Amino acid sequence: MTTCSLERKINLPVEKVWSLISNFTKSPAPEIKIEVEKEGDPAAGGVGTIRMLTIGRTRVREILDTVNPPHSFSYRIIGGTPTKEYKGKVTLEGKEDTTIFHWHADIKPIVPLTGGIVCMVAKGVINTFVDALEKHHT
């Protein structure tokens, strides 16, 4: 298992960042395409939601596992990556009018000894996601 993490400062209040990223059915920026495959509980965007997320040429299927408003959610990637297992968590920490965005993932790659490469690619996708948030909302 490979553990990956990333921390970014976003120049938006935590409530705004949460409103942009917590609904699994809505895209926070035009560069991020979301197709809902299955609605969650209690409604679309809730636990159990399955979506296809596209950022550039990267396409992954994700399922939302937990939501803890207004600061964290966890998810799994269930398709589109060279992994046997991928469990991710996003946590937001408010600091005055900014947000510290924490991302953590435990990744088990299909090919042994490639965890570092998979982690590097995942970090690139997460950075692109955060960059898009900042570009369109700050």
Give residue ranges: language-model regions.
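Hydrophobic ligand-binding cavity/cleft-lining segments
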Residues: 1-43
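Glycine-rich portal/gate segments that line the openings of hydrophobic small-molecule binding cavities
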Residues: 26, 36-81, 132-138
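Hydrophobic/aromatic beta-strand elements that line small-molecule binding cavities or substrate pockets
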Residues: 6-8, 60-66, 86-94
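A short, structured loop/turn motif at beta-sheet edges
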Residues: 11-14, 66-70, 91-100, 138
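A conserved amphipathic terminal alpha-helix motif
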Residues: 100, 106-138
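Residue-level recognition of conserved beta-strand positions in structured domain cores
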Residues: 64, 77, 94, 103-105
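Beta-strand elements of well-folded, non-transmembrane domains
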Residues: 12, 81, 94, 107-109
